[in-house]
From Swiss-Prot:
Domain 2Fe-2S ferredoxin-type intervals: 1-104
Cofactor: how bound: Binds 1 [2Fe-2S] cluster.
Any Gene Ontology CC annotation: cytosol
Sample GO molecular function, one term: metal ion binding
Gene3D superfamilies: 3.10.20.30
Protein name: 2Fe-2S ferredoxin
Species annotation: Buchnera aphidicola subsp. Schizaphis graminum (strain Sg)
Family label: Belongs to the adrenodoxin/putidaredoxin family.
Origin superkingdom: Bacteria
Keyword Nucleus included in the entry's annotation: no
Entry-linked InterPro entries: 2Fe-2S_ferredoxin-like_sf, 2Fe-2S_ferredoxin-type, Adrenodoxin-like, Adrenodoxin_Fe-S_BS, Beta-grasp_dom_sf, Fdx_isc
SUPFAM superfamilies reported in the protein's UniProt record: 2Fe-2S ferredoxin-like
Its biological purpose: Ferredoxin are iron-sulfur proteins that transfer electrons in a wide variety of metabolic reactions.
């Protein structure tokens, strides 16, 4: 069973965390199931970038991304070459390491 390692996040997960997950789950579902309140303003419909995350290890083991996800990711704050929308990234059979950016587009607009 693969594991997902969330790096420490100042507000959502100060000490980081490691959780077992099932192959085929999305990063967002694993986060929510483990009480990580990762924002997802569009309710997992690939219409916003609030669930943006950066994959630090295991990027190539995730599902491929769609053109729609790529277009939405272009609007994400702090975009990197290994960025994914956590609502779309499906976990494979390899452990991954995920960084949740300190800010997301909603935070920047609202604050």
């Amino acid at each position: 069973m693969p594991k997902i390692f969330f790096l420490p996040h100042k507000l959502l997960l100060p000490k980081g965390g490691c959780f077992e997950c099932k192959e085929g789950e999305t990063i967002l579902n694993v986060a929510l199931k483990n009480n990580i309140k990762l924002e997802h303003a569009c309710e997992k419909s690939c219409a916003c970038s609030t669930c943006h995350c950066i994959i630090r290890k295991g990027f190539l083991s995730l599902s491929g991304w769609s053109e729609k996800e790529e277009d939405v990711l272009d609007k994400a704050w702090g975009l990197e070459s290994t960025s994914r929308l956590s609502c779309q990234a499906i976990i494979g059979n390899i452990d991954i390491e995920v960084q949740i950016p300190l800010y997301n587009t909603n935070y920047i607009i609202e604050n």
